[in-house]
Amino acid sequence: MLIDIAVNITDKLLAKDESSVEEVIRRCKDSKVLPIFTGLDHQTSKICINLAKKYKTVSTAGIHPTSSSRYSNIDEIVPLVNDETVVAIGECGLDYDRLEFADKVSQKRIFRSQLDLGGSCYFFHSRSCHRDFMEIVSDYRIRGVVHSFTGSIEEARELIKKGLFIGINGCSVKTLEGIEIVRSLPLESLLIETDSPYCKIRRSYAGFEYVTTDFSQQKALKKKNEPCCVVQMAEVVSNATGKDYDLVVETILDNTIGLYGDVLKKSVERWGL
């Protein structure tokens, strides 16, 4: 089985209504994939928690950096991060590519506030901000994953040295440099994701040549990304590095459960995958 650590289940492009969510979950189970739902703010975190309870999976809860300007504090989030289905605080961090949504000051303030909660695990967003990101997290003893990684090999190694995992998806293997980064990093430092409905491994991406499972014949998956497609990321890691596929799956599964702990482990058992 596989675990997709980043599923934007509240995004209408992924599932526009309740029946669409049911279909996404059905395809997950058919593909033996457990989805972790991603909270982006107070409202989406609440929805993710409720859906996680309904479908016996888990979620994150937090404030995405681009939502930072809408919050003067994080009081609304605190009860949510303590919910029994929440495995990590996040999505939180910094995003300097989209400062039109929230300035650097707001992002840093809300980021630090979430780190001050002292969570057991964090689901991080870091985009074009590595130096500031590292400066902030260096003040904390944390465990977590930097998801949708598109930085340099030097940045990845610095994050790993801090004790963080690297989350990779289609955007991570868009270029030949991205493939080389995947080859260079220890398998024990990787988690995989779709960030669905985004970050699909497109035909124009360098990573596409390492994909063996074709979802294009399924109408629902022709254009969008879904958590069931995370199998393609496992294939890219295996085929690009020359490592045995079963070893890749087993190692990344161990990494994921090791990071998220008993709450995720129990969810895996409930799904019976």
From Swiss-Prot:
<feature type="binding site">
    <location>
        <position position="91"/>
    </location>
    <ligand>
        <name>a divalent metal cation 2</name>
    </ligand>
</feature>
<feature type="binding site">
    <location>
        <position position="195"/>
    </location>
    <ligand>
        <name>a divalent metal cation 1</name>
    </ligand>
</feature>
<feature type="binding site">
    <location>
        <position position="147"/>
    </location>
    <ligand>
        <name>a divalent metal cation 2</name>
    </ligand>
</feature>
<dbReference type="InterPro" id="IPR050891">
    <property type="entry name" value="TatD-type_Hydrolase"/>
</dbReference>
<dbReference type="GO" id="GO:0005634">
    <property type="term" value="C:nucleus"/>
</dbReference>
<dbReference type="InterPro" id="IPR032466">
    <property type="entry name" value="Metal_Hydrolase"/>
</dbReference>
<keyword id="KW-0378">Hydrolase</keyword>
<feature type="binding site">
    <location>
        <position position="91"/>
    </location>
    <ligand>
        <name>a divalent metal cation 1</name>
    </ligand>
</feature>
<keyword id="KW-0479">Metal-binding</keyword>
<protein>
    <recommendedName>
        <fullName>Putative deoxyribonuclease TATDN1 homolog</fullName>
        <ecNumber>3.1.21.-</ecNumber>
    </recommendedName>
</protein>
<dbReference type="GO" id="GO:0008296">
    <property type="term" value="F:3'-5'-DNA exonuclease activity"/>
</dbReference>
<dbReference type="InterPro" id="IPR001130">
    <property type="entry name" value="TatD-like"/>
</dbReference>
<comment type="function">
    <text>Putative deoxyribonuclease.</text>
</comment>
<dbReference type="GO" id="GO:0046872">
    <property type="term" value="F:metal ion binding"/>
</dbReference>
<feature type="binding site">
    <location>
        <position position="125"/>
    </location>
    <ligand>
        <name>a divalent metal cation 2</name>
    </ligand>
</feature>
<comment type="similarity">
    <text>Belongs to the metallo-dependent hydrolases superfamily. TatD-type hydrolase family.</text>
</comment>
<dbReference type="Pfam" id="PF01026">
    <property type="entry name" value="TatD_DNase"/>
</dbReference>
<dbReference type="GO" id="GO:0005829">
    <property type="term" value="C:cytosol"/>
</dbReference>
<keyword id="KW-0539">Nucleus</keyword>
<keyword id="KW-0540">Nuclease</keyword>
